[in-house]
Design a protein with these regions (language model features):
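Intrinsically disordered and other compositionally biased segments
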Residues: 8-9, 137
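Surface-exposed acidic/polar loop and edge beta-strand patches at domain peripheries
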Residues: 17-130, 138-345
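Hydrophobic h-region of N-terminal signal peptides that target proteins for export
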Residues: 9-16
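Positively charged n-region of N-terminal signal peptides that target proteins for export
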Residues: 1-4
Length: 345
């Protein structure tokens, strides 16, 4: 049985196939070996934030903005023995392109162990993209699962000057001991290392604490990564009813920033399901989702790249205008408008 499982999880193709959308203002590309967003850049400033990838030779491996599903983090010991991979199967299997027309595309993947299917629809509009993912439980039984977006930025976009901002609020360090890791509680952008405050907006040569999770109290969550010298902002917007958690991962190599995860999802506790189900909630937010037999659940987010008119030290707020736009305001008072692709949500 285990041999069969390993065959099912093996890459179906050795050469990566990429699905690319290009509207003349921006281009965005998805690697069908694993389904990750691996390239997003403006035509007049060709800098791709999504250069990070895990080491290895497998065609389907973690890279760029990948999806974690049916879990975030490690399986249980029994699941590991059954062949369940870290962060779930969805970024370890081949995706199949369903269609592509102009600036829209559809792709799909099946998770043979989890018995889940996912269909992703991407619509590129200006320098933003709307991504909708519909998850279907193919089993005759309901089950708990998790779905965490794992955008991971890397050099050369990522360096010591990049600033991360968000409307996240209460949080906790994943390194805090169970069963109550939410104590001590911190508030974005603060974290604690050995009892001393750490500002997670910046990353220089010390990644600790390397994973800190926060909840968002507003109707919509947002997170941005701003490069001051390049005047370039990468950002995400999502509905917190769908993704209540923001998880910040930081990684350094050779004393330099190497990866920053801007991870939003259905859970904020990096533990196997036996622990998640016992814990249940933190800060009143659930640590897992439930999908019934044959049910389909959809979630969506907006990703954008914008160039600022002048250098800035960070994004102070992102607000919805009600007239089809988001307004990004810098700490210096600059305003940049982004089309609201989540309108009506």
């Amino acid at each position: 049985m285990r041999a069969t499982i390993l065959v099912l999880l093996a890459p179906l193709a050795l050469l990566a196939e990429t699905l690319t959308l290009d509207n003349g203002s921006a281009k965005i590309a998805w690697d069908l070996s694993g389904g990750a967003l691996v390239d997003f850049q403006l035509k007049d400033q060709p800098i791709n934030p999504f250069t990070w990838q895990e080491q290895g030779t497998a065609a389907a491996r973690l890279r760029g903005h990948f999806l974690c599903m049916d879990r975030w983090g490690a399986p249980s010991a029994a699941e590991i023995s059954a062949g369940v991979p870290f962060h779930g199967e969805v970024s370890r299997v081949e995706w199949r392109q369903l269609g592509k027309s102009g600036t829209e595309a559809e792709m799909t993947a099946r998770l043979p162990l989890a018995r889940l299917g996912v269909k992703r629809t991407v619509k590129l509009d200006g320098t933003s993209a709307l991504v909708t993912e519909a998850v279907t439980n193919e089993a005759p039984l309901g089950r708990v699962y998790n779905m965490v977006q794992h955008p991971t930025i890397g050099p050369p976009f990522l360096d010591e000057t990049v600033v991360v901002d968000s409307n996240a609020r209460q949080g906790f360090m994943q390194s805090s001991p169970m069963p109550n890791p939410e104590h001590p509680t911190v508030v974005w952008p603060q974290a604690l290392k050995d009892g001393m405050p750490v500002n997670l907006r910046m990353l220089k040569d010390d990644p600790l604490p390397n994973v800190v999770s926060y909840v968002v109290d507003d109707e919509f969550g947002w997170v941005t990564a701003l490069h001051p010298d390049k005047r370039l902002v990468l950002g995400y917007l999502w509905k917190t009813a769908e993704y209540p958690w923001l998880n910040i991962w930081r990684h350094v190599e050779a004393g330099k920033p190497f990866a920053r995860g801007l991870e939003f999802g259905t859970t904020g506790l990096h533990q196997p399901y036996p622990i998640l189900t016992r814990k249940g909630r933190i800060f009143g937010r659930s640590l897992f989702a439930f999908i019934d037999a044959t049910e389909t659940q959809s979630r969506r987010y907006q990703v954008f790249l914008v160039k600022l008119p002048a250098t800035a030290s960070g994004i102070s707020q992102v607000r919805r205008t009600g007239s089809g736009e988001w307004v990004l305001e810098t700490r210096e008072g600059q305003q940049v408008r982004v089309k609201d692709l989540l309108a009506g949500q």
